[in-house]
């Protein structure tokens, strides 16, 4: 998983630019998880790209991994303006975007939600206030049961 996060950061280096500080706080003791790496790389790309855009070239992007009970958590945070309370419930809706026309399709977070929840049996949660927005992706350590 850490390899996918690192490769996503490399891929987005030009977009991240020099005004955004990247903080990586990776728990190296995390177990391997049953996952589709290419799909998760799409999630990391969507979340990191959104965070970078929210900060408008200046701020701190924090990527943290840790274990919480029977899940591995990837937290991607930014120091942008935050998501207004009245929009938090809508961010995972298909075609919902706060970006200007032509700059976003409103599908990135919907796709990310489907990959994490439907494809991996995990969860993705938004916590946001001005200066501290975090998407927390929770992925099960074990295969989801098919019962």
Where do the model's predicted regions map?
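Core catalytic ATP-binding domain of two-component histidine kinases
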Residues: 1-147
């Amino acid at each position: 998983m850490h390899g996918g996060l690192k490769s996503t950061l490399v891929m987005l280096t030009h977009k991240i630019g020099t005004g955004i500080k990247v903080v990586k706080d990776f728990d190296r003791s995390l177990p391997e998880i049953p996952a589709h790496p290419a799909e998760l790389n799409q999630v990391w790309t969507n979340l990191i790209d959104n965070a970078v855009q929210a900060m408008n070239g200046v701020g701190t992007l924090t990527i943290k991994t840790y274990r919480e009970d029977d899940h591995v958590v990837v937290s991607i945070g930014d120091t942008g303006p935050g998501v207004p309370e009245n929009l938090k419930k809508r961010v995972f809706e298909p075609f919902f975007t706060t970006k200007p026309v032509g700059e976003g399709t409103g599908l990135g977070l919907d796709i990310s939600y489907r990959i994490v929840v439907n494809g991996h049996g995990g969860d993705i949660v938004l916590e946001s206030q001005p200066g501290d927005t975090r998407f927390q992706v929770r992925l099960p350590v074990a295969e989801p049961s098919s019962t």
